[in-house]
A protein has these predicted regions:
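ABC-type ATPase nucleotide-binding domains, specifically the catalytic core motifs of the NBD
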Residues: 13, 31, 69, 92-111, ...
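The feature captures the beta-strand-to-loop junction immediately N-terminal to the Walker
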Residues: 34-36
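Helix-to-loop junction immediately C-terminal to a conserved catalytic motif
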Residues: 49
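ABC ATPase NBD coupling module
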Residues: 53, 65-85, 109-113, 129, ...
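Conserved ABC ATPase "signature" region
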Residues: 64, 99, 110-128, 182
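Conserved ABC ATPase signature
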Residues: 132-140
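Catalytic Walker B motif of ABC-type/P-loop ATPase nucleotide-binding domains
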Residues: 160-164
C-alpha cells in the first residue's frame, strides 16, 4: 500500500508554488520532504494531507484517486495527520484526550480502556495520564498527539503525515520522538515527515526528497543526499555533517 502524488501543480495567480512534483510513501518506510524556505515543501505536504488541492495532478492511495477527498475522509481510509501547531485539548487530561478520539472511532466501547492503556504504555505517558494538557511538557504533548493519531480507526492508521514533529521540543524529546517514529515504521506504518530540523529528520528517514523552487531537486537516502553536490550547494551547505 502506498500514497503517491503524481505530477501535482499548485499556483496562486500567475505564481507557481509547486510544479509537476511526484513522490510516494509506502507502508513500513519513513520518507522526508525537505528544502529551504519557499521551496514549496509545505504546500506539497498539505496536498498530501488534503489541506490543499492541486490545480493539476493527482493524489493516490494505491489505485484509489483521493485528490479531492478532504482530510477527515482520508483519515477514514487510514491516513493520519499530525499538525505542527499544538492540538492537545489543554483542559482535558492526557487520558481524556485519547478517549475523546476513541469515541469518534468504530472501536467498540468495551475495548476503549484497553486500547488507551496500550497507547499510554506505548508512548510512555502512564505517569501523566491524569495530567491536564496545559501542564505537560513539549515532548509529552508531542507524544500525546502521536498517540491520539494512532487511536483513529479500528486498526489505527496505515500512514502518518508529520508536520514539524521536532519543532518546539528539547533534544531529549527529539530523541524519544525519533525512537517512536522508528517503532511505528516497524509496525508497517508509512510515515512522511517535513521538518526544518534537517539532521534529526535525515537520521531516521529511509529516503527523502529535497525541493527547490517548487520542484524536486533530488531524492535518495541520507548518504546519497549528503554526497549530492546540488543538494549541498542549494540546501545543506559545505559544512553540514550527518
Amino acid at each position: 500500500v502506498k500514497i503517491a502524488l503524481e505530477n501535482v501543480h499548485k499556483s496562486y495567480g500567475a505564481r507557481a508554488i509547486v510544479s509537476r512534483v511526484s513522490l510516494s510513501v509506502a507502508q513500513g518506510e519513513i520518507v522526508g520532504l525537505l528544502g529551504p524556505n519557499g521551496a514549496g515543501k509545505t504546500t506539497t505536504f498539505y496536498i498530501a494531507t488534503g489541506l490543499e488541492k492541486p490545480n493539476q495532478g493527482s493524489v493516490w492511495l494505491n489505485d484509489q484517486d483521493i485528490t479531492l477527498l478532504p482530510i477527515h475522509r482520508r483519515a477514514r481510509l487510514g491516513i493520519g495527520y499530525l499538525a505542527q501547531e499544538p492540538s492537545v485539548f489543554r483542559h482535558l487530561t492526557v487520558r481524556e484526550n485519547l478517549l475523546l478520539v476513541m469515541e469518534q472511532t468504530e472501536v467498540p466501547r468495551r475495548e476503549w480502556n484497553s486500547r488507551i492503556d496500550f497507547l499510554l504504555q506505548e508512548f510512555r505517558l502512564e505517569k501523566v495520564a491524569h495530567t491536564l494538557g496545559i501542564q505537560v511538557s513539549g515532548g509529552e504533548r508531542r507524544r500525546t498527539e502521536l498517540a491520539r493519531a494512532l487511536a483513529i480507526g479500528r486498526e489505527g492508521p496505515k500512514f502518518l503525515l508529520l508536520d514539524e514533529p521536532f519543532a518546539g521540543v528539547d533534544p531529549i524529546a527529539i530523541s524519544e520522538i525519533q525512537q517512536i517514529v522508528a517503532r511505528l515504521r516497524d509496525r508497517q506504518i508509512g510515515i512522511l515527515i517535513t521538518d526544518h530540523n534537517v539532521r534529526e529528520t535525515l537520521a531516521i528517514t529511509d529516503r527523502a526528497y529535497i525541493m527547490r523552487d517548487g520542484q524536486i531537486l533530488a531524492s535518495g537516502s541520507s548518504e546519497e543526499l549528503y554526497s549530492n553536490p546540488l543538494v549541498r550547494q542549494y540546501y545543506l551547505g559545505d559544512n553540514f555533517q550527518l
